Amino acid sequence: MLRLLKRNIQISKRIVFTILKQKAFKGNHPCVPSVCTITYSRFHCLPDTLKSLLPMSSKTTLSMLPQVNIGANSFSAETPVDLKKENETELANISGPHKKSTSTSTRKRARSSKKKATDSVSDKIDESVASYDSSTHLRRSSRSKKPVNYNSSSESESEEQISKATKKVKQKEEEEYVEEVDEKSLKNESSSDEFEPVVPEQLETPISKRRRSRSSAKNLEKESTMNLDDHAPREMFDCLDKPIPWRGRLGYACLNTILRSMKERVFCSRTCRITTIQRDGLESVKQLGTQNVLDLIKLVEWNHNFGIHFMRVSSDLFPFASHAKYGYTLEFAQSHLEEVGKLANKYNHRLTMHPGQYTQIASPREVVVDSAIRDLAYHDEILSRMKLNEQLNKDAVLIIHLGGTFEGKKETLDRFRKNYQRLSDSVKARLVLENDDVSWSVQDLLPLCQELNIPLVLDWHHHNIVPGTLREGSLDLMPLIPTIRETWTRKGITQKQHYSESADPTAISGMKRRAHSDRVFDFPPCDPTMDLMIEAKEKEQAVFELCRRYELQNPPCPLEIMGPEYDQTRDGYYPPGAEKRLTARKRRSRKEEVEEDEK
């Protein structure tokens, strides 16, 4: 808070000591520099006690300059002041007459007198610094990084300004914000509608909304955190009809944590940098892509052996294949991709892809749109070269987000309609839109999907963060489920949805709720015949955890994850020591910390 004050005090000390204690021999006196540079904007912000210590010439010269406001641009102008001639007379009483002393004792007395004089000046400066009231200077606002100027002509006025400012800061901190609306008012509002949502009785996260101050919200979050049991996760959806028995496919995204932890790691996202391409050429990048595809074959085999028949393929399968300068086609990997397709056809294993967040065909920048079109063509080439059967080829969709809102949602939707016509027919057949957790809700995207015949992926976790005109939580969305399903069935594609849960179930703000949990503990109220992508950090372990909780057989939970009495002689893909990966990350880290403390 007082950083600027300390800086000015140090500057004032530096100014005085530059005049009185300079050891360079300039001019006729060893203590007087020929030219002293003083910043006039800093002179005006010095206290009077420090101004009085400066030589008369610098005071008169600087006082005639216009006063500069103390702000962001105040420390820019500097003026040199020639103090050589004037200071000779003013320092005469400090150092004595300017004449050579013939005796040694006389020189010693002169040096001692100069030392006493400079020490007295230093003491005066320290006293003025100690007595300097910080309330009359700048203080830093607790709500922002910009300094607030409370400097005034009198101390009483400055204290009044400080008190007013602190009251304003407290009022801003206690400013009420809409956290949730009252349940009763929502019931009254919803009673007039045709659809009456079912309000869960045991829902720990209130779907109500009421006005709370920021401080009371923090207290509520602390209380809920204290009462939270780590082994009793919150149920996100308390619907009457859970989709059990589950007849669809449960899947995970991109990475298998168990195979990734093996000594010979199996994963499909090896990548590099452009400098590697420039140094080693495209052949080195193609070798990485070949290794990724070979590991994808192992992943499909592993999934089938453990009952999983749905997975998202990593977009990094072939690094920089869609780059504007270093891009390349995939003829060299045709045979390996066909092998993946044969296994998928054999096991009825669904494969999808999800281009990254920078693939935005609604961007106002033409460069971004061109890159997005190339990226979508690259993803389509991967899936097309697998030569999947008719249904699996339809089900091999490309999921994208609409992106930012930029100038406005209406303008962004118009750009999407325009740039959508630039896509190839093959990409159009695979393209799917997903509601996000920042800008675009289900209600924003559903009319566009109906207009352009694009399926809509419903992400339940994103809907809980950006509910649009509906309430967060689930059941208000139920009337739209048939309309969303129709966007899939009219193109003959098996419907899929995304489900995840927040890593912090007690979080209030959307920013804190976006992070995905390690595993999920509930089912959304969806059709049990569709495909459900579990987006959790523990990947396939989250799928097995869900199967264990609900005793599902699609896929069955492996014995390695059921408990301590599993069969260790079972021939599986679990490497020795991988059972540590079968526990949640936070619980595993706590256990390891306890073991280290005991040692």
Swiss-Prot record:
Which Pfam family is one of this chain's hits? UvdE
Q: Name one GO biological process term.
A: UV-damage excision repair
- Is the DNA repair keyword given for this protein? yes
Q: Where is this region: Disordered?
A: 89-224, 561-599
Whether rRNA-binding counts among this entry's keywords is: no
Q: Give the UniProt entry's GO cellular component terms.
A: mitochondrial chromosome; mitochondrion; nucleus
Q: What does this protein do?
A: Endonuclease for the repair of UV-irradiated DNA. Involved in the excision of cyclobutane pyrimidine dimers (CPD) and 6-4 pyrimidine pyrimidones (6-4PP) which forms the UV damage repair (UVDR) pathway. Also functions in oxidative damage repair in vivo. Provides back-up AP endonuclease activity to apn2 together with apn1.
Family classification? Belongs to the uve1/UvsE family.
Task: State the protein's name.
Answer: UV-damage endonuclease
